Amino acid sequence: PILGHMLQGLDVEQNPLLTFGQDKPMPVVYEDDDLVVVNKPAGLLSVPGVEIEDSALTRIKNLYPNATGAILLHRLDMSTSGLLMFTLNPKANKRMQRQFIKRQVQKTYIADVEGVVANNHGIIDLPLAPDYYDLPRQMVCDKTGKASETHWSVITRSKSTTRLALKPITGRTHQLRVHCAHPEGLGMPMVGDELYGVIGERLHLHAHKLEFTHPTSKELITIEAPVDF
């Protein structure tokens, strides 16, 4: 009661973390009775954080309040933009989860790296593990790391950067970022990667394409979202 009396007449500002990211639109690029795919902007969480409530999952639950199961099937880092898939009912979720587990969903990312890549394509196979002394960073570790494989190909080259198409075969945390930056990978960090390279306006990593079999119709679906950097 005393504190309430003291605060009377004072304007208490709302915690800015509660509305963090709400100025970033998240367009729906595909929807039906089973699935929703959105183009997540860079700077928006995939799921709610400890302090930040706004997220792709929160927005989907608000957009589809009658869905029997708005479930996120995979995640993107907060600084990564691009395609995220949600299921809207338990049956679709079970069938799509099976595809993700069996690695039947094909994902293609587009990234810009610092430097000019000499070869036109290749495969990076470096095991990854959390760097517990410097989280959330991940590190290459032959002893405790989990198998991680990335296929890459060059799209374009400029004087100082290279645009790549990246296809992760596995889905480890920061896999694409570490595989590009590590000396045993490409040895070239992504543009704007504050964890493994040099900080910039934004991370140049975008989830560009999803290819999968529809859980109900069994039709092969391909969805793309244009790069915005």
Please place each PLM-identified region on the residue numbering.
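RNA pseudouridine synthases
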Residues: 1-229
